[in-house]
């Protein structure tokens, strides 16, 4: 699948602008029919208030868990990330994997897709951790043979010292964490010597904040053809409309706004009642350099970086942090 996306991306770059626009128009029509069919089973949200606001942890209830994949999941990206974990850590060739002593933990596992993919490809001791009971219930329903626990990874006692060979933190999870130093210190404590933390980070000023569900088949980013960065998304479900907008942290020279704090705001509007559910995600987004400097101060060595452009996620990266013995 990853190889297909590489080849397809090369093909897209080779055709003329008019050919590309025609191709995208056809794909958009196909996408609209597919999306309408895929989202037909999603029921509308129910609330007594005309306008209700959810923030951070409270957002991840059963309704949001049910629509999450429609908005955010990219199977090719998950597969690519798991392949990178396997290649970097050598888990499948490690003798400890056979007796389940090679342990991988996915922090902020959500609906459990990475845990499942790792298990499917041969990692025998993988556990997913998330704070949201609703997301974990979805994960357990989807993947009953995988292991999941509910917990807050900001609590040092959640896991034992030197329990894991590998920890992962994907898809903006780290940006919900205000105290990055405490988070990295916990990870360092839980890792065995020579263990890895694989961390998803983005270039906050250039990554594409349009949700995957709002892009036709994930073929090409509209940012390439926009004069200004597109920050808003629109997805139509059967009985409600989804809108989102991302506001990047202000520049360091700005006189207003909180340093390193961005906002991702979602609005879900019921077609019949007009009631609105607003989700406010607060992202604590230091620059990648600032983040990696903190990691070094905690004790990590930065051993590598994977650019996710090959799965059409430009300006998004996996950084490989190692606890050197």
Located regions from the model:
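Conserved class I S-adenosyl-L-methionine
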Residues: 20, 25-98, 113
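A short SAM/SAH-binding and catalytic strip from SAM-dependent methyltransferases
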Residues: 165-179
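SAM-dependent methyltransferase
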Residues: 199-292
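C-terminal lobe and adjacent flexible extensions of AdoMet/dcAdoMet transferase-like proteins
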Residues: 284-325
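A short glycine-rich, Lys/Arg-flanked "PGG" loop and its adjoining helix->strand segment in the class I
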Residues: 181-196
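Short, low-complexity, Lys/Arg-enriched N-terminal segments of secretory-pathway carbohydrate enzymes
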Residues: 1-12
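A short acidic, Gly/Pro-enriched loop at the edge of an enzyme's catalytic core
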Residues: 158-166
């Amino acid at each position: 699948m990853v190889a297909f996306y590489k080849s397809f991306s090369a093909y897209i770059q080779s055709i003329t602008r008019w050919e590309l626009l025609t191709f995208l128009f056809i794909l958009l029509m196909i996408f609209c029919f597919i999306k309408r069919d895929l989202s037909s089973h999603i029921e509308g949200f129910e609330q007594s208030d005309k306008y209700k606001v959810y923030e951070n942890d409270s957002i991840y209830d059963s309704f949001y868990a049910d629509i999450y994949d429609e908005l955010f999941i990219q199977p090719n990206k998950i597969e690519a990330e798991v392949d990178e974990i396997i290649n970097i850590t050598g888990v499948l060739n490690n003798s400890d994997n056979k007796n389940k002593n090679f342990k991988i933990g996915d922090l902020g596992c959500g609906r459990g897709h990475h845990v499942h993919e790792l298990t499917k490809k041969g990692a025998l001791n993988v556990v997913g951790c998330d704070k949201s009971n609703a997301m974990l219930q979805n994960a357990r329903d989807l993947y009953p043979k995988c292991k999941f626990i509910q917990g807050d990874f900001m609590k040092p006692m959640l896991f034992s010292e030197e329990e894991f060979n590998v920890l992962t933190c994907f898809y903006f999870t780290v940006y919900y964490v205000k105290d990055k130093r405490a988070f990295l210190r916990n990870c360092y404590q839980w890792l065995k010597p020579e263990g890895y933390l694989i961390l998803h980070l983005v270039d906050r000023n250039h990554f594409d904040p349009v949700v995957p569900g709002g892009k036709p088949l994930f073929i090409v980013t509209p940012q390439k053809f926009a004069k200004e960065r597109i920050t808003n998304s629109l997805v139509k479900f059967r009985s409600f409309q989804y809108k989102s907008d991302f506001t990047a942290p202000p520049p360091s020279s700005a006189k207003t706004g909180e340093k390193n704090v961005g906002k991702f705001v979602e609005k879900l509007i019921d077609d019949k009642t007009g009631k609105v559910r607003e989700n406010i995600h607060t992202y604590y987004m230091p620059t990648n350099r600032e983040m990696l400097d903190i990691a070094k101060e905690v004790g990590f060595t930065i051993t590598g970086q994977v650019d996710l452009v090959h799965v059409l996620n430009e300006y998004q990266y996996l950084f490989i942090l190692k606890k050197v013995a």
